[in-house]
Amino acid sequence: MLVIYAKLEISARDRVEIEDIRQRFDRLQGRVEPHFTLVFPFAGVPLDDVLDHARSIAAGVAPIPFRLAGVAAVPDPLSPAAHLFLLPDEGDQTISDLHDRLYSGVLARNLHPTAVYLPHVTVGRFERYEDAKTAAASLPAVDIPGRLSVMTIGDFDGEGVEDLHNVRLGAP
């Protein structure tokens, strides 16, 4: 399945902080870098069409500064599982707008009709919401500034992601 995401451009110190959390709580740690998912895994659209669409959208979007400042336990809307998210308090609306623009054109039919997008970096996955809440309460506050300047189209197999194409934001 294809997926579109943006890897975090952050300091080495902040990357270690995120990876330490992920090592404790995220089974995909080490298989995909910390990122914002912009288009969730999907099938049925040819890669060339996805690449053309992503390039078209990216050309009109400048690199996005953000700041991760919140930690939240969030129930999975499609299962009994839950996630541990780092949430931005800066850049979140711009990331949401990019997500919305990507889910147009050839990708419009892949938007889940009841899904509400919350920009986030996943740092934990849990079978039960209560476990995610406990993990969130155990973490110190975060303050991680960064930037997104590249979207990556990847091939997600359920266990990890293989990068296929990078698309630079703001590139004609």
Predicted regions and their residues:
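Histidine-dependent nucleotide/RNA phosphoesterase domain, centered on the 2H-phosphoesterase fold
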Residues: 1-172
